[in-house]
């Protein structure tokens, strides 16, 4: 994912590694952790900040690299938690997995079969075209567009380390019901379930079956872990949030109320029903005295997360007033936090 999109890359003569970053709204935003040894990260961050003439932030920093940013004078705030699965312990057995197990059994009874797809195989073009169609249908139904920064793309047009798992009906002879694109996590011997798509009328249990089959397949191949990705703004429980009370209030307000264009609650609930073995915190680090509205705006822009089309999608005339009311409340809250930070 770090090699996709319109990112730039910083290297230092003093460190074997690099930072992926993007400039947005006058800010420099680092994508995830520095790619280097933990012991070398402070030096790489220091060189990077010295080379930039703008405020610097880093989105989705892990606890492993958090101290490196703190050593270089960065403040930080928790922005959500990432769902992590230990593949050696992954199972559908037990009471807590009853709903997921029932969904997978339903899909199997309906003839849904999961296989790995290779986009550059000789006979792959037909399925590639169908994958694109399913993706566009899903995005249109959700009122979304492809997000960026730390989310990958479908990438069917170029060879890569991505792996594609496809669920097809009629015992693998029918249409594509849904699919998942996985990205390798080299440092942890695992994979990230990056892009998940399904038809609007997909067989019930399709995505649950995909997730379970992917985990079983990767475990059998000797991989250690799977990440379902970040649940943004969910489970904000870091004690240091008290140092950023206004922004914390704003994030919790957005999580509870602002779910028209980007359903934070739904993202969390979907991950939570699989009962991850760990919820790892992720942070936004910044080298300013306070987390400014400008930095928040830059982060939203670089992720391409909110658009007017998204705000109004899937809402009729009766719902439009409610949407604008929520949007206005969000803007008022944002401005209040900004004014109070001065």
Labelled PLM ranges:
Residues 43-45:
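Inter-domain linker/hinge segments that demarcate the starts of reverse transcriptase
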Residues 328-333:
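Flexible acidic/glycine-rich loop/turn elements at helix↔coil and beta-strand↔loop transitions
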Residues 1-34, 59-77, 82, 88-103, ...:
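A conserved beta-strand-loop-helix scaffold within acyl/acetyltransferase catalytic domains
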Residues 35-40:
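Short, glycine-rich nucleotide/cofactor-binding loops
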Residues 335, 339-342:
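Polar low-complexity intrinsically disordered regions
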């Amino acid at each position: 994912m770090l090699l996709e999109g319109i990112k730039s890359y910083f290297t230092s003569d003093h460190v074997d590694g690099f930072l992926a970053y993007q400039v947005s709204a006058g800010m420099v935003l680092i994508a995830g952790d520095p790619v280097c040894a933990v012991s070398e990260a402070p030096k790489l961050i220091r060189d990077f900040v010295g080379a930039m003439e703008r405020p610097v932030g880093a989105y989705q920093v892990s606890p492993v690299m958090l101290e490196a940013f703190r050593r270089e004078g960065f403040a930080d705030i928790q922005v959500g938690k990432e769902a992590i699965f230990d593949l050696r312990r992954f199972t559908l057995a037990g009471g807590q997995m009853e709903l997921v197990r029932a969904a997978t059994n339903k899909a199997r009874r309906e003839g849904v079969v999961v296989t790995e797809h290779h986009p550059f195989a000789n006979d792959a073009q037909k399925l590639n075209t169908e994958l694109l169609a399913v993706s566009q249908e899903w995005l249109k139904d959700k009122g979304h567009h492809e997000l960026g920064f730390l989310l990958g793309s479908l990438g069917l047009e170029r060879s890569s380390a991505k792996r594609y798992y496809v669920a097809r009906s009629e015992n693998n002879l029918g249409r594509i019901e849904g699919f998942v694109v996985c990205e390798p996590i080299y440092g942890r011997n695992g994979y990230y379930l990056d892009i998940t798509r399904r038809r609007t009328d997909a067989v019930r249990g399709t995505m649950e079956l995909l997730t379970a089959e992917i985990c079983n397949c990767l475990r059998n191949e000797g991989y250690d872990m799977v990440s379902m990705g970040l649940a943004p703004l969910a489970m904000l429980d870091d004690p240091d949030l008290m140092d950023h009370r206004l922004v914390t209030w704003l994030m919790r307000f957005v999580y509870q109320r602002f779910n028209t264009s980007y359903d934070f609650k739904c993202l969390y609930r979907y991950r939570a029903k699989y009962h991850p073995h760990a919820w790892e915190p992720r942070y936004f680090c910044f080298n300013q005295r306070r987390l400014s509205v400008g930095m928040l705006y830059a982060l939203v822009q670089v992720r391409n997360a909110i658009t007017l089309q998204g705000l109004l999608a899937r809402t009729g005339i009766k719902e439009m007033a409610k949407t604008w009311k929520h949007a206005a409340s969000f803007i008022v809250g944002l401005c209040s936090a900004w004014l109070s930070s001065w």
